Regions:
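Glycine/threonine-rich beta-strand-loop-alpha-helix active-site module
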Residues: 67-153
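Gly/Pro-rich interdomain helix-loop hinge
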Residues: 244-321, 358
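ATP/NTP phosphate-donor binding region
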Residues: 1-83, 309-310
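Carboxylate- and glycine-rich phosphate/diphosphate-binding segment that chelates Mg2+/Mn2+
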Residues: 123-229
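Glycine-rich phosphate/pyrophosphate-binding beta-alpha loops
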Residues: 117, 220-253, 333-338
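Short, amphipathic C-terminal "tail helix"
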Residues: 318-359
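Short glycine/serine/threonine-rich phosphate/pyrophosphate-binding segments
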Residues: 14, 20, 38-41, 66, ...
Length: 359
């Protein structure tokens, strides 16, 4: 039996923020990346929502901490909004989710992603960091009521962010497709997400803004997919490494994905289906899987992303020093529960050795 549920209303296209008027907000709290403090977007959102009062929280940082979420929660409890809007990347959306969740207050929650990667606008996940460890918070109450995918927000994305976020989409889609919780519907969404990234991400990276909405939508589809099916070892290790070294999450996924695919060879028939669906060919499963892995490596190179932790600026000596902590954090990460092969310490150490690189 397959159960599929998505409560989030998704509005997509140019000028989509006008949909805020549906909410009839009176007291609007905006949780946003600091960048937006210097723009007119907060006031535009207030106008679009016809809100009487606006409060802002611009203190979001990459890898939001438990302490930051607690500070934001106090703002929710003090201001008592009827509507909370999260604007920004995955960190802003995750921080806002935690603020709403821990405040215990009933609000309308809207997510407006300004990057194309995390899919947090449609997931029941939020990632908070404490003492160098990333902790996934998973609860259906974290699902936004509305997600707004506005093409106008994508025009000025920096190339590095397009690249990092694009590999986050790929990791979400690939891992959800082979996850133990996957079903026909989640796999269809994941497969379309993979194909869209291979088809459009290089163009977006090269500066073609007309295709960016399609990549944006792919991130949302992959987010819905993994919210239903779960993720896997790539994300477990990415969380562990990110907590230690503060490398962008998508960049870590780009480094890890090919090695994790090898470790998950028991899922090769599913990887092969993905490869064929993305137009990568391969009549035999082994050929299709190789084509998919090589396509990931080629795309990583085309987007100027590192292939090892060493290339990402982390010396092998630092990795060796933190290995035990990384392995423990990865194996205790909830994402391991839906990996197609139950990960063990030997597997994680082997992958870590593969991706460390030469100093």
């Amino acid at each position: 039996m397959e159960i599929f549920s998505c409560k989030t209303k998704i509005i997509s296209g140019s000028g989509a923020i006008s949909a805020l008027s549906e909410l009839k907000a009176k007291r609007l709290l905006l949780v946003a990346d600091p960048y937006f403090q210097k723009t007119d977007l907060p006031n535009r959102l207030k106008t679009a929502a016809n809100a009487e009062a606006l409060e802002t929280f611009f203190e979001v940082t990459p890898d939001p901490t438990v302490e930051l979420a607690a500070k934001g929660t106090a703002v929710v409890q003090r201001f008592k909004p009827d509507t909370v809007v999260a604007l920004g990347g995955g960190s802003a959306m995750d921080c806002a989710k935690a603020m709403v969740y821990f405040s215990g207050q009933p609000v309308q929650f809207v997510a407006i992603p300004s990057t194309s990667g995390s899919g947090s606008e449609v997931t029941d996940f939020a990632i908070l960091t404490h003492d160098g460890v990333k902790h996934p918070l998973v609860d259906r109450k974290l699902l936004p009521d509305m997600a707004i995918l506005d093409a106008h927000l994508l025009d000025s994305l920096p190339k590095s962010l397009i690249a990092d976020a694009g590999f986050d989409i790929l990791a979400h889609a690939l891992e959800s497709f082979v996850a133990t919780g996957a079903g026909a519907i989640s796999r269809a969404l994941a497969a379309d997400g993979v194909k869209a990234v291979f088809d459009y991400l290089p163009e977006s990276y090269a500066g073609n803004t007309s295709v960016r909405l399609r990549v944006h939508q792919a991130a949302t589809m992959a987010g819905i997919a993994f919210s239903q099916s779960g993720l896997g070892l790539c994300h477990a290790m990415s969380h562990a490494l990110g907590g230690q070294f503060h490398i962008p999450h998508g960049r870590l996924n780009a480094i890890l994905l090919p090695a994790v695919m090898e470790a998950n060879s028991a899922a090769n028939s599913h990887y092969a289906d993905l490869a064929r669906g993305a137009g990568l060919g391969g009549a035999a499963d082994t050929v299709a899987v190789r084509n998919l892995k090589n396509a990931l490596i080629r795309l990583r190179k085309e987007l100027n992303l590192p292939s090892t932790l060493s290339q990402a600026g982390i010396p092998p000596s630092r990795v060796r020093q933190a290995t035990d902590t990384i392995v423990q954090a990865a194996l205790s990460d909830p994402c391991c529960a839906t990996n197609p092969v139950k990960p063990d310490e030997k597997t994680v150490r082997h992958i870590l050795q593969q991706v460390t690189g030469v100093g």
